[in-house]
């Protein structure tokens, strides 16, 4: 074996030891190194390959030490053209990404390469993507509400500033739209910094998101990191860590409050499952990797608030076949401060966001944190909706006429509440033709208190559809009466 000197990703040059490829199985590559020169776990290795039309550098991440100077690595790019005997050099450090203001307004891949401006950030500061979570004595003990202006969220499943929020739902119920709405609201209302991680989702969605953010003028405050559906599992497994590293810099060095959006955390788990099988690990329940809980914990424990600064994470979580007992969503539940469950039946009723008010939860929905009035109104809304749910079987079999008079009143009130929990989104303006509404929390509590007391039972149910505040409801009712 020979020693070589290699460029260290634009961060200066370092002595790098050369190994050689001994086996290639899809994205998993075994590499042999000289005795005493075996690279550390998570180090990035570089392999130069030449295809008929182009020469390129593959990045391999060390995943296992096999013994006899062999390491098993996972490739971050397709391994087409990689053959046994190809020289591999150790960079001496983990995969590193650019950090700081330079990443705002740009699109990166999991390796930290800028996709819209090639080479951007490589001559500046870079951080490795494998980092330890903040020390226990550095964590923030204070609990604050993150006000979103979305009624159903602020009232029934309030988000924690510096917390972890899960958006659960099957395919097509509105997870990505809700994330796009949150990015827009945070940028417009709070002038905050956002980092978006596209993990294993459709390339088209990434393009749409970039164009929409550009149109709305919020791109300059957001860093986008993509490892999409067509990427190898190694990239999909690491892209969330790359985005989180950028967010940590804004929190720890610049002292900013950051929002980290991950779409979709299920694809992170799925990529880990693919890699685990190729690495020869025995599968666990439903075919998932045996290290599922550890991998999820390593990611989630880094998303937290430190003294005076926070990373608030909003994670879209695809639920396979709408089965919440699947190990992927079930493992994520343990780390979350709030869960927003998107319901297909509510979506089919045309109520957006299609949040299920009865199954969505928040650990801060208690009087000591949100206040006695907020807690009382939220519980009254849930009580009315729960009673309506219990009566639905009777209504379906016998009809409304068989209900007692007080139950008829309650059903009408519940339907008004159900419709009033929806509202127009800013990102949907071009589709609906209606301006998006931002409702202050104080107004939300007062409005639902009045609706629960029956002050608006005389207005038609349809007047409550996609309205912001009660003024919008009354205006819609007058318009309907005029027709």
From Swiss-Prot:
Gene Ontology CC terms, in alphabetical order: plasma membrane; proton-transporting ATP synthase complex
EC annotation from Swiss-Prot or TrEMBL: 7.1.2.2
Location(s) in or outside the cell: Cell membrane
Matches recorded under InterPro entries: AAA+_ATPase, ATP-synt_VA_C, ATP_synth_F1_bsu, ATPase_alpha/beta_chains, ATPase_F1/V1/A1_a/bsu_N, ATPase_F1/V1/A1_a/bsu_N_sf, ATPase_F1/V1/A1_a/bsu_nucl-bd, ATPase_F1/V1_b/a_C
GO molecular function list: ATP binding; ATP hydrolysis activity; proton-transporting ATP synthase activity, rotational mechanism
Keywords: ATP synthesis, ATP-binding, Cell membrane, CF(1), Hydrogen ion transport, Ion transport, Membrane, Nucleotide-binding, Translocase, Transport
Membrane topology: Peripheral membrane protein
Organism in which the protein naturally occurs: Rhodococcus erythropolis (strain PR4 / NBRC 100887)
Protein family membership: Belongs to the ATPase alpha/beta chains family.
Gene3D superfamilies (alphabetical): 2.40.10.170, Bovine Mitochondrial F1-atpase, Atp Synthase Beta Chain, Chain D, domain 3, P-loop containing nucleotide triphosphate hydrolases
Name of protein: ATP synthase subunit beta
Main location, first listed in the record: membrane
